Design a protein with these regions (language model features):
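Internal, conserved structured core segments that host functional sites
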Residues: 113-115, 119-169, 173, 194-195
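N-terminal Rossmann-like or analogous alpha/beta NTP/dinucleotide-binding catalytic cores
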Residues: 2-139, 257, 296-298, 306
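Extreme N-terminus of proteins, especially the signal/transit-peptide cleavage junction
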Residues: 1-3, 346-347
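A generic structural motif
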Residues: 11, 149-150, 208
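Conserved nucleotide- and phosphate/pyrophosphate-binding catalytic cores
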Residues: 157, 163-353
Length: 353
């Protein structure tokens, strides 16, 4: 069986460091590992419209922004197909067929859907498209016969729902769809990076993000304003590491060489944590260290992005080429689905028998 990756992002804004440690960095590693036959990376504009139907311009403006972020982090269009979801109409038809395999009550039990309905204040009036987007995601994944879906922890319920749809379809119509597996980040801190305000999730809509394209002074300003341990009022006070976003970010970003370069009095992060917990280490010092670490990580990404910004026609051609490949692959899967469901009427020689 071919090893195939499908992953992607909603174009509702520029991508941030939560995307980077949660998925983007891993995508680049997998892309360069040589272990996968095909990689599809989707700019999920149709999904973004499920809660932005009254503001399509917002989605339109961010198509290229997301593509630029992909190219800046190292996604190689020679190794991965970057495509736009709405340019693959077969996905909509697959979603329609899968809707018959999922109950309303099952969608209501999806923890990710429940949390996002609450976050977006949709409790009293839920758009149908938004409510059913786990089914749309299942269409996205199965259309490309994905075996692996790199994603953050918050996407686990979505993958489970997709697997249920695959199991049900294959049980009813015969073995047709490929069963996908989720691939979570190995670093626990990368599963869900908190916002700079200490909230559970970094989110564009909450305004608590550090963007991959942020300028150095903006990054520093955001880091220096980060939430820490509210009980750590004086330098000499013992501080808490658990639930402290600054240390969560250091878990996700810092490497031993960063200590040698930026904070040589400590050999590693464990030593820094021990000192903070003991007392005698101020928040300003650890924030300055985090700033140095993140500037080192984000500078080459920002520079590559600025280079691609000068080549926008080439970026558009990359999206066109990727979308053409994606459409061809999805069309083949849809043909198999229609055949299994026995609704490929004009391809069926037994129709009149």
């Amino acid at each position: 069986m071919k090893q195939i990756i499908l992953t992607g992002d909603r174009p509702t804004g520029r991508l941030h460091v939560g995307h980077y440690v949660g998925s983007l960095k891993e995508r680049v590693r997998l892309q360069n590992s040589g272990k996968f036959d095909e990689i599809y990376i989707m700019i999920a504009d149709a999904q973004a419209l499920t809660d932005n139907a009254d503001n399509p311009e917002k989605v339109r403006q961010n198509i290229l922004q997301v593509a630029l972020d992909y190219l800046a982090v190292g996604i190689d269009p020679a190794k991965a197909h970057i495509f736009i979801q709405s340019m693959v109409p077969e996905l909509t038809e697959l979603s329609f067929y899968y809707m018959n395999l999922v109950t309303v009550s099952r969608l209501q039990r999806n923890p990710t859907v429940k949390a996002e309905i609450q976050q977006k204040n949709f409790e009293t009036s839920i758009p149908v498209g938004f409510f059913t987007y786990p089914i749309s995601q299942a269409a996205d994944i199965t259309a490309f016969r994905a075996t692996t879906v790199p994603a953050g922890e918050d996407q686990m319920p979505m993958l489970e729902q997709c697997r249920e749809i695959v199991h049900k379809f294959n049980a009813v119509y015969g073995e047709t769809l490929t069963m996908p597996e989720i691939l979570l980040p190995q670093n626990a801190a990368c599963l869900r990076l908190p916002g700079i305000d200490g909230r559970a999730k970094m989110s564009k809509s909450l305004g608590n993000c550090i963007y991959l394209s942020d300028e150095p002074e903006d990054i520093k300003k955001k880091i220096m304003s980060m939430y820490t341990d509210p009980g750590h009022l004086r330098v000499q006070d013992p501080g808490k590491v658990e639930g402290n976003p600054v240390f969560t970010y250091l878990d996700a970003f810092s490497r031993p060489e960063h200590f040698a370069e930026f904070l040589p009095e400590y050999q590693n992060l464990d030593e820094l944590k021990t000192h903070y917990q003991r007392g005698g280490l101020g928040d300003v010092k650890i924030k300055k260290f985090l700033n140095s670490v993140m500037q080192a990580e984000l500078e080459p990404i920002r520079n590559r992005r600025k280079e691609w910004e000068q080549r926008l026609p080439e970026v558009v051609e990359i999206l066109k080429a990727g979308s053409a490949v994606a459409e061809k692959t999805a069309a083949a899967t849809l043909a198999d689905v229609r055949k299994s469901m026995k609704i490929d009427y004009f391809e069926d020689d037994n129709l009149l028998k």
